[in-house]
C-alpha cells in the first residue's frame, strides 16, 4: 500500500517522502487507517518492522490538523511511554523527522540525567512527550507535566515494560490521563500481563499483528559452536585470538552474565565494556560512543539494553548465550551485515540450550553450519557412567532392603518377647 493512499496532510506526506518511504510496511498498512479514525489499538510487532512510524504518522497528522501552523503556547497532546532511554530517544528522533514541516514540538525525558533542562522544556511547552515511566512520574509529582489536553497515549514495548517491572508505573500513568483519550499499545509478544492491561484500559480496541520476519540477511555468515557451558569463556578467548575479531557486539541473557564476561575479557587484556540497565544513562552513552570510535573492541550487551542501539558497519556479532525467543536471534544478528557490508554471526550453543537453538533453526528455515575446528566441543557422555550409576543405585537399593528386613525382624523378635513378659491392657 502506498503512503499516498492514506490521505495524509501535505506537510506530513512531504516528510515521509524525504525519508524515502513509499510503500507502507505490513504493520503500518494495518494500523494507520484505524489510528487515523481515532480507534484504540493493540499492535503486535517486532522492533524493526516500522511500528514507530505506524503510530507516529497518524499522531503527527492528527496534531497538525488541530494546531496547524500556529505558534501559540503548546500543550502536551501525546504521551509515548518507552521502557528504555535508548528507545525513547529513538522514538523522539523519528517524531522529529516526520514532523519537520510542521510546528509540532517533540521532547524526550528519561532518568539518570539532570532534571533542569527537562523542566525548562516542559515549562516552555511541547506537543509530544516521549518518556520513561519513572522520570514521567517524578516530574508529574512536581507538577511539571499536565495531561489535561492529552489526545493520545502510546505504550510502546509493553512486554519489555512487564519484564522490567514498570507495569505498575504504567498503570499509575494511565490513570492520570483523561478517560476519553485514544490509547495505543505495541508489543513484540503478548504475555498475559500485557493482555490484561489492554483489556483493562483500552476501549473496543482494534488488534493488529504481523508475523515476525523469519529471514536473516543474505550477506550475514552464520556459524555455530557446540560448547559445554563451563567452556564458553575458553572458547571465546580462542575465537578472538584465532580469528582476530574486533568491533564485536556480544550478547548475553542477563546483566550479571554481561558483567561476568567483561571481567573475563578485561583480565585477558581486551578492551571490553557492557551496557545494561544497571548502568547510568551517561555511562551507557559514553560506552556506546567509545565503541563507535573503536576505543572499545568488544561491547557486551543484554537484549533489553541493546534495543534502540544503532551502530553502523558492525562486522561481528557473537551470541554468547542463546536467546530463548527465536525472533530475538534474528534481531541480534541483524545488527551486522547492513548497507551491503559483510557480517559474521557466531553462536555458542550450550548443551542446555539445544532446544532454543532448534527453535531458532526452525524459524529461520536453515541448519546453521557447525564449526568442526572447535577445541571445546560437547563432551561425549561416558557410556560407563550410566552403568556405574545403575550399579550404585542397585547396591543402595539392596542395602536399604537388607536394612529394612533387619529392622522388621528385630521388631518381630521384640514383639515375641513382649508377648511373654508384658500384660495386655484388655
State where each predicted segment sits.
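Conserved helicase RecA-like core
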Residues: 2-379
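Basic Arg/Gly/Lys-rich low-complexity intrinsically disordered segments
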Residues: 69-71, 293, 361-426
Amino acid at each position: 500500500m502506498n503512503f499516498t493512499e492514506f490521505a495524509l496532510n501535505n506537510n506530513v506526506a512531504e516528510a515521509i517522502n524525504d525519508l524515502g518511504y513509499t510503500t507502507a510496511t505490513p504493520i503500518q498498512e494495518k494500523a494507520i487507517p484505524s489510528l487515523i479514525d481515532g480507534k484504540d489499538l493493540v499492535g503486535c510487532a517486532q522492533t524493526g518492522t516500522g511500528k514507530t512510524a505506524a503510530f507516529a504518522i497518524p499522531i503527527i497528522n492528527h496534531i497538525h490538523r488541530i494546531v496547524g501552523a500556529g505558534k501559540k503556547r503548546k500543550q502536551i497532546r501525546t504521551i509515548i511511554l518507552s521502557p528504555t532511554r535508548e528507545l525513547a530517544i529513538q522514538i523522539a528522533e523519528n517524531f522529529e523527522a516526520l514532523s519537520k514541516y510542521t510546528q509540532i514540538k517533540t521532547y524526550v525525558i528519561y532518568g539518570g540525567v539532570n532534571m533542569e533542562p527537562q523542566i525548562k522544556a516542559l515549562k516552555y511547552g511541547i506537543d509530544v512527550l516521549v518518556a520513561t515511566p519513572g522520570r514521567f512520574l517524578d516530574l508529574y509529582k512536581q507538577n511539571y507535566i499536565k495531561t489535561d489536553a492529552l489526545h493520545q497515549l502510546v505504550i510502546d514495548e509493553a512486554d519489555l515494560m512487564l519484564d522490567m517491572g514498570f507495569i505498575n508505573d504504567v498503570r499509575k500513568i494511565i490513570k492520570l490521563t483523561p478517560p476519553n483519550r485514544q490509547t495505543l499499545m505495541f508489543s513484540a509478544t503478548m504475555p498475559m500481563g500485557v493482555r490484561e492491561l489492554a483489556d483493562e484500559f483500552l476501549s473496543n480496541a482494534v488488534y493488529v499483528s504481523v508475523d515476525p520476519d523469519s529471514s536473516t540477511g543474505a550477506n550475514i555468515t552464520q556459524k555455530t559452536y557446540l560448547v559445554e557451558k563451563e567452556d564458553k569463556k575458553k572458547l571465546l578467548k580462542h575465537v578472538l585470538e584465532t580469528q582476530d575479531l574486533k568491533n564485536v557486539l556480544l550478547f548475553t541473557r542477563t546483566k550479571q552474565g554481561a558483567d561476568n564476561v567483561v571481567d573475563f575479557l578485561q583480565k585477558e587484556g581486551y578492551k571490553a565494556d557492557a551496557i545494561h540497565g544497571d548502568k547510568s544513562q551517561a555511562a551507557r552513552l559514553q560506552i556506546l560512543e567509545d565503541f563507535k570510535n573503536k576505543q572499545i573492541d568488544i561491547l557486551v550487551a543484554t537484549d533489553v539494553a541493546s534495543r534502540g542501539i544503532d551502530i553502523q558497519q558492525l562486522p561481528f556479532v557473537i551470541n554468547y548465550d542463546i536467546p530463548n525467543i527465536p525472533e530475538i536471534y534474528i534481531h541480534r544478528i541483524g545488527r551486522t551485515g547492513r548497507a551491503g557490508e559483510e557480517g559474521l554471526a557466531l553462536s555458542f550453543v550450550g548443551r542446555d540450550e539445544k532446544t532454543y537453538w532448534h527453535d531458532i533453526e526452525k524459524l529461520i528455515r536453515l541448519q546453521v553450519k557447525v564449526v568442526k575446528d572447535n577445541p571445546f566441543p560437547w563432551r561425549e557422555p561416558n557410556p560407563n557412567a550410566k552403568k556405574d550409576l545403575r550399579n550404585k543405585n542397585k547396591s543402595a537399593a539392596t542395602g536399604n532392603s537388607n536394612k529394612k528386613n533387619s529392622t522388621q525382624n528385630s521388631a518381630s523378635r521384640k514383639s515375641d518377647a513382649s508377648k511373654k513378659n508384658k500384660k495386655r491392657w484388655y
